[in-house]
């Protein structure tokens, strides 16, 4: 089974968290699920560099990457990931969704209402407790 090391941005602004929704993917179990934005770490990158790059690629959104919030390991049916989430501060008030179909700014209490990708559930639980 293929394994990926990935990073996720827990972007917080005015006590709300940025959540993005995937479109249709090649796997039904990740299609239209909500997630924290991020992606794979490329060879030669630090996790923080990867996260800043991914948010620029996916959203044209400059961020400052802060401390790690949580690391989760998850096995999907076709691949597994180790994902580290970092608290991030936006450096702009605007962004553009290049890869996702929707976004929401959610207060902590609202996070549990979304249909999350399985790997992101541990991060949501960490933020809500």
Label every model-predicted segment:
Residues 11-12, 19, 88, 105:
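Conserved hydrophobic "DFG−1" position in protein kinase catalytic cores
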Residues 87, 95-127:
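NUDIX/MutT-family hydrolases
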Residues 62, 72-94, 102-104, 108:
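Active-site-adjacent beta-strand/loop module that shapes the phosphate/pyrophosphate-binding cleft
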Residues 67-71:
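Conserved S-adenosyl-L-methionine
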Residues 1-18, 40:
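Conserved N-terminal beta-strand and adjoining loop/helix that marks the start
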Residues 16-57:
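Conserved Nudix-box catalytic region and its N-terminal flanking loop in Nudix hydrolases
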């Amino acid at each position: 089974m293929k394994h990926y090391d990935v990073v996720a941005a827990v972007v917080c602004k005015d006590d709300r968290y940025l959540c993005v929704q995937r479109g249709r993917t090649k796997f039904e179990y990740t299609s239209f699920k909500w997630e924290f934005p991020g992606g794979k770490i490329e060879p030669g990158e630090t996790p923080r560099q990867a996260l800043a790059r991914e948010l620029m690629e996916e959203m044209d959104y400059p961020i400052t990457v802060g401390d790690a919030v949580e690391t989760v390991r998850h096995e999907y049916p076709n691949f597994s990931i180790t994902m580290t989430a970092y608290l991030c501060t936006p450096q702009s008030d605007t962004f553009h969704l290049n890869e996702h179909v929707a976004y929401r700014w959610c207060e902590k209490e609202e996070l549990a209402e979304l249909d999350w990708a399985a790997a992101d559930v541990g991060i949501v639980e960490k933020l809500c407790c």
